[in-house]
């Protein structure tokens, strides 16, 4: 039986001007154990497309978010290489290969947005 990787959209909050912009993620993605799933995160040339500072977070219910990918494609120590990040134009992607049951979670993207805005 397939199980879902639930996705939410993370807003980028402007810390200087208090401007706010949204990075667009699909509402959900799903796959069966062993398969691969790719999650997209679409922004603009002012955020995702303009900088190589896209991060991805995984959050299980009741737990704090965990950094999975930073600077588009870098993995922190301890994150399995089943998780990989990439970017093309204004869209960043997170691919989870060899899906495992523990991968079922919420996944958030974030991007630097310029002018001291995140």
UniProtKB/Swiss-Prot annotation:
Signal peptide region: 1-19
GO cellular component: extracellular region; immunoglobulin complex; plasma membrane
Keyword Signal included in the entry's annotation: yes
Region of interest (Disordered), ranges: 76-97
Protein name: Immunoglobulin lambda variable 2-8
Oligomer status and interactors: Immunoglobulins are composed of two identical heavy chains and two identical light chains; disulfide-linked.
One example GO MF annotation: antigen binding
Keyword Disulfide bond among UniProt keywords: yes
């Amino acid at each position: 039986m397939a199980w879902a990787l639930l996705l939410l959209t993370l807003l980028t909050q402007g810390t200087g001007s208090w401007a706010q912009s949204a990075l667009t993620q699909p509402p959900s993605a799903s796959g069966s154990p062993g398969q691969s799933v790719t999650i997209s995160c679409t922004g603009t040339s002012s955020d995702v497309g303009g900088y190589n500072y896209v991060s991805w977070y995984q959050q299980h219910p009741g737990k704090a978010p965990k950094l999975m990918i930073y600077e588009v494609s870098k993995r922190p120590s301890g994150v399995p290489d089943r998780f990989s990040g990439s970017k093309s134009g204004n869209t960043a992607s997170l691919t989870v290969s060899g899906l495992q049951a523990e991968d079922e979670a919420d996944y958030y993207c974030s991007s630097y947005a310029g002018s001291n805005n995140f």
